[in-house]
Amino acid sequence: MATKTNHIAVVAENRKARHDYDIEETIEAGIVLSGSEIKSVRAGRVNLRGSFARVIDDEVFLYDAHIAPYEQSGKYFNHDPLRPRKLLLHRREINRLNGLVRMKGMTLVPLKIYLKGRRAKVELGIARGKKIYDKREDIARRDAERDIERALKRRIRE
């Protein structure tokens, strides 16, 4: 019997989300894709910038995630690149997410799409939007940490 490997390969990452939002918690969800969509995902032709997820009628959907049409299939057998895609979660997870998102200022943001074994997964972040001054504080903190690292490196060399 063949051994099972759960090799994880990140296909697309939403770096802007970590800059624009304060991520409270992350959750893994499956995603329902058609044949040409999964082929495009495996080829890495996914863009998550500006995408978001919503809970509608006890189901979670991913909106504005661009999965490019598959090159090798004809123009008639391809998918709509921006169609809403259903995310697969357990009922209790959906209810919990629905409760968290109803809180003021909370939203569901896809952080990355990756392949886990043969299946495509989405990492969702339960996030709160950052204010402009929060973003500036983060940048200043990163710059200060970088300066400290440089100073320590210089001191070690001497």
Curated annotation (Swiss-Prot):
Chief localization: cytoplasm
Nucleus recorded as keyword: no
Keywords: Cytoplasm, RNA-binding
Compartments (UniProt record): Cytoplasm
GO MF term list: RNA binding
Record-linked InterPro entries: SmpB, SsrA-bd_prot, SsrA-bd_prot_CS
GO biological process: trans-translation
Entry similarity comment: Belongs to the SmpB family.
Its biological purpose: Required for rescue of stalled ribosomes mediated by trans-translation. Binds to transfer-messenger RNA (tmRNA), required for stable association of tmRNA with ribosomes. tmRNA and SmpB together mimic tRNA shape, replacing the anticodon stem-loop with SmpB. tmRNA is encoded by the ssrA gene; the 2 termini fold to resemble tRNA(Ala) and it encodes a 'tag peptide', a short internal open reading frame. During trans-translation Ala-aminoacylated tmRNA acts like a tRNA, entering the A-site of stalled ribosomes, displacing the stalled mRNA.
Protein's name in the database: SsrA-binding protein
Name of the gene encoding the protein in the UniProt record: smpB
